[in-house]
Amino acid sequence: MRTRTLILLVLLVILAFLGNAWLIPTIVCAADYTGRVVGVIDGDTLEVLNGHHAERIRLSGIDCPEKGQAYGQKAKHAASDLAFGKEVTVQTHGLDKYKRTLGDVLLPDGMNLNQELVKQGWCWWYRKYAPGDTVLEGLEKDAREAKIGLWVDPAPITPWVFRKARRGQSLER
């Protein structure tokens, strides 16, 4: 009888755990939310209040110049001018390799921050991670042709090439 009770108890514990297993992805990949932008780390990384904690958001589909790179500070200022202190909606798309939330940030007027930074010429459409995004592709093309933002430079160095060079790897555009 004791063995039977013990087996039943173990099975109940396992079932209780499995019954809540569907909650795990929710914890790992948060749902969309609204919060105030409390920090701008660089052109493509923000901190947004999610409840009582600041969550680091990596803007998906774009790549801005690095802090120490040409146009890096201008990209950061553009993101700050557009979003800092504002109540935004974060549309989450999972986590990146640094455990930052990937997402699109919608400004109070409905404007997509990711797209606006590309439109203003402060970043690249990140083809590697958003290969089918024809909106970002078109916005980058328009900014290049208009020679606005970093596109005033006839041959700007992409952030991924800049990062490689900083690590001592060969510089290829």
Feature map (PLM): residue ranges:
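Small beta-barrel nucleic-acid-binding modules, primarily SNase/OB-fold domains
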Residues: 2-173
